Curated annotation (Swiss-Prot):
This is C2H2-type transcription factor MSN2. It comes from the Eukaryota. Keywords: Cytoplasm, Metal-binding, Nucleus, Repeat, Transcription, Transcription regulation, Virulence, Zinc, Zinc-finger. The gene is MSN2. SUPFAM superfamilies: beta-beta-alpha zinc fingers.
Amino acid sequence: MEAAMLQPQSVAQAFLNNREFKSDARKAYLFQQMPATPIYSRPGSSCSQPPTLYSNGAHKTTMLDADVYDSHFPSTPPLSTSGSAIGSPKMFDALQTPINPMFSGLDGFPGKDLFDSVETSVLDWSSCASPPMTPVYIASHPLALQQSTSDLVSMTSCPSLSPSPSPAYARSIASEQDVDFCDPRNLTVSTGNPTLAPEFTLSNMGDADVKGANARPTFDFNPAISHDLPSFQNLDDLDSEDDFSNLVNIEATATGETTRPRACTGSSVVSLGHCSFDDELAFDDNDTFSFLPFPSADATTDVDDGHRDKKLKTSPKNDAVVASEPTDDEVEATSAASVSSESTVSSPSDDNSPTVSAPSRRGRKQSLTEDPSKTFVCDLCNRRFRRQEHLKRHYRSLHTQEKPFECNECGKKFSRSDNLAQHARTHSGGAIVMDLIEDHASHFDGSAMPVNAGDEFSYGKVMFQIGSEVSEITEDASDNKKKRKRTD
């Protein structure tokens, strides 16, 4: 019975017979039924593997030899003193310091209770296994009153140590000999007889200061030189200043103005070209130039030319019309001054007397050098010029005293045309006729000249005919070039 009942139940669990009434009755759909409880695989089965975890952290440190410091001494050398410690006397023997027992192990050292009071553990230096701390003097300790002065080390016996050590620690060194700690006070070596400086006394301090203040270092500026080495001797050539006395002779005059020529106009100054005037301005070696004097007590301001003519203010337009030159009087003064300078100025003498400078002159300084570029030579004075008009001007102004240029307003005559133009600016007139007066007859301008009526009529007729012919020619040319307009 039980077997017969289990078989249909197992089939019912596995399959479900589902018939749809709308579809064909002969077709039956069978599908698997999900179990009520989930099924898990066994933990130890082959299908379940633990997940693999990757760690990026640092690896665990592995100690290969843990007892390194138990069986070996430390790499740091033990505490010891040298023969030249600072503050200690210089000795040739040294006292070796015993090794600190905390590194070598305290064999047979009895264990210490963990619950000692703080005061006793601090004051009892022999109870700890570490190196002793810096000795301090504790005034509240009751044994400090009974401590004798023999336990304290004075400054004379050990000057490099503290004057107030701990009395408990000093007593523990004398009593406890089983713990071999390093006592800094026992590092002092035996006293010998070193070579030390004399003892410093306060009584001689004032005298030492006075001696140090009065002492001055002395230097020997004449050292002994061996015979095989060359020595520098004094240069006797530079002892005298006579060679440099006549290098620059500055004339102490107050009229030392570096000015442009008086005849320069505005246009010539702007263009920086005085080509018509500066061709003969090549200064020779004997000419002296005057500059502003240096502020010295010996400087005298002597003015050779006592008067100075007033320069008239002229408009720039008149300056640009005609380039003017110095007047005839100035040229004559220039020539006279140049002749006098030739006679007075001589070659520099051997003595140290200052050279006599030529008197200041107002005109241009003429060149007396034999310049090959100056091809025009004066027959009378052998002066050379670069241009022929310069030679003619020289002839008329100096030798012949010819004055062919005359002013129309006042009748004054001039040897040069630029002098006449400069003089004409003083008048208020208009046009100036600058012609050579060969027949010594003065000419007048057009306003004063009589004009014939026939000539005026003929001139007007000719001008009218020329104007009409020009107009006809222009009209014919315009008709030929005219295009035909498009007619719509």
